[in-house]
Amino acid sequence: MRDVWSLPCRKSLLGVAAVVLVSGTLTGCSSGDSTVAKTPVPPSTTTGTISTIISSAPSPPFATAAPPTSNTPPDDPCAVNLASPTIARVVSELPRDPRSAQPWNPEPLAGNYNECAQLSAVIIKANTNAVNPTTRAVLFHLGRFIPQGVPDTYGFNGIDPAQTTGDTVALTYPSSIDGLATAVRFHWNGNAVELISNIAGG
């Protein structure tokens, strides 16, 4: 009886061993376990490549601003400043143009406003689309608006720098002769503005 059973057992054991061997071979060759993934990369090659790329790249500039140097001059408070917020504030508070009933445009047409002059002025116009809008001068003493005691300044449309000094402003208006302008000088006498003279100019 022992000889009868031994042959089939051997055959079944051989069959099982063959199945195990084939499945082990298939598992070793699966797509998730490739020979490329198992091939080690020498660490010295990768590190050397990365360090070469980093060292050859130019260093980025720093975004921090350079500190100001002592050679940079401060803003001059005595310089002409037609963009001063004082001008816009004063102009916004003026009575409207009597001819058009419109407010005044806060952007000066001309002027020499600064905070240090005994007398300075800006020329403004009515905020209208008229061909010849009303113009006027606004006078300042040490950068502060002079609201009272000022002669009529309507109609002036420019400043003559040749006749203007630290305490005198020469305002101009067109004359009846083309190309000629008339200058009227306003002077700060220490207490108020006074009219000096009319001078015809070119």
Swiss-Prot record:
N-palmitoyl cysteine: lipidated positions: C29
Alphabetized PROSITE patterns for the sequence: PROKAR_LIPOPROTEIN
UniProt membrane topology term: Lipid-anchor
Protein's cellular compartments: Cell membrane
Signal peptide (from-to): 1-28
S-diacylglycerol cysteine lipid attachment residues: C29
Family matches, as InterPro entries: LppP/LprE (IPR025971)
A family per Pfam: Lipoprotein_21
GO CC terms: plasma membrane
Source domain of life: Bacteria
Keywords on record: Cell membrane, Lipoprotein, Membrane, Palmitate, Signal
Record-given protein name: Putative lipoprotein LprE
Gene, per the UniProt record: lprE
